Swiss-Prot record:
TM regions (residue ranges): none
Tissues expressed in: Expressed by the venom gland.
Molecular function GO terms recorded: phospholipase A1 activity
Subcellular location: Secreted
The protein's name in its UniProt record: Phospholipase A1 VesT1.02
GO biological process, one term: killing of cells of another organism
Temperature dependence: Loses its activity after heat treatment.
Coiled-coil stretches: none
Length: 301
């Protein structure tokens, strides 16, 4: 059995606002005929959410991210569903054998997002400063490729790309042009949670290493709990959007300072407001094993 060849028709979009939460799927052609889109975009920030290998836009943890954004009331969320090209529909026993096939589709899906972005900018006058991309695993690299493509198209840079535990296999040794990179947007935020499915390599403007970027609390033994750790990046980010917790990043060092001594000029809160902090670089983030994952006794900076 061979995976279905990639085409733009194999990628679907779900368009959500706080007023419209129906999980209707759109293609590139049908979105152009979506008459309500213009009015929706004018009023909102735009966030693309992109899943990874063998997943889908309707996976529970991605819908939770969308819901958290919509609860803020000022977002239009475009969920990219590339499940066919991500081998989600393949027979369970052979999915892993098709990983490289999914990898080869990442740039194509990134170009697809860039095409949608071009339509938003040129047809609906959406400023690039109003658009942020959020991607998990392979979806993080897809977001990076979209960031490269919109620059090639002369559209400028996205406001921000947030990479949720970018996939390590096939990417960790690649140069900037072949993976998500700090130049792909005005601000690139990376949340590291696993060192096998993800990567410990610094990739962004800021790199947050949750529990040192591996073996997340509550996920069990190393290797066995790797999938749990890999997905935990999405859950941490969702909690940060909800503001139930400020996950504070401390500058990485051999002996990182206690969170209790953090100031706004030295440390950074993970999430949508990270780019409002002056510090960039790599940060260690202590976390707990259960939601909301805080390990700072409610401290905010």
């Amino acid at each position: 059995f061979l995976p279905i060849p990639y085409s733009d028709d194999t990628v679907k979009m779900i368009i959500l606002t706080s007023e419209n939460k129906k999980h209707d799927f759109y293609t590139l052609d049908t979105i152009k005929k979506h008459n309500e889109l213009k009015e929706s975009i004018i009023k909102h920030q735009v966030a693309f959410i992109t899943h990874g290998f063998t997943s889908s836009a309707t996976a529970e943890h991605f819908l939770a991210v969308a819901e958290a954004l919509l609860d803020k009331g000022n977002y239009l969320v475009i969920m990219i569903d590339w499940r066919v090209a991500a081998c989600t529909n393949e027979i369970a026993g052979v999915k892993l054998a098709y990983y490289n096939y999914a990898v080869s589709n990442t740039r194509l899906v990134g170009n697809y997002i860039a095409t949608v972005t071009k339509m938003l900018v040129q047809k609906y006058n959406v400023p690039m400063a109003n658009i942020r991309l959020i991607g998990h695993s392979l979806g993080a690299h897809i977001s990076g490729f979209a960031g490269k493509k919109v620059q090639e198209l002369g559209l400028g840079k996205y406001s921000e790309i947030i990479g949720l535990d970018p996939a390590g296999p096939s990417f960790k040794s690649q140069e900037c042009s072949q993976r998500i990179c700090e130049t792909d947007a005005n601000y690139v935020q990376i949340i590291h949670t696993s060192n096998h499915l993800g990567t410990e390599r610094t990739l962004g403007t800021v790199d947050f290493y949750m529990n040192n970027g591996k073996n997340q609390p509550g996920c069990g033994l190393p290797i066995i709990g790797e999938t749990c750790s890999h997905t935990r990046a999405v859950k941490y980010f969702t909690e940060c959007i909800r503001h139930e917790c400020c996950l504070i990043g401390v500058p990485q060092s051999k002996n990182p300072q206690p969170v209790s001594k953090c100031t706004r000029n030295e440390c950074v809160c993970v999430g949508l407001n990270a780019k409002t902090y002056p510090k960039t670089g790599s940060f260690y983030v202590p976390v707990e094993s259960k939601a909301p994952y805080c390990n700072n006794k409610g401290k905010k900076i």
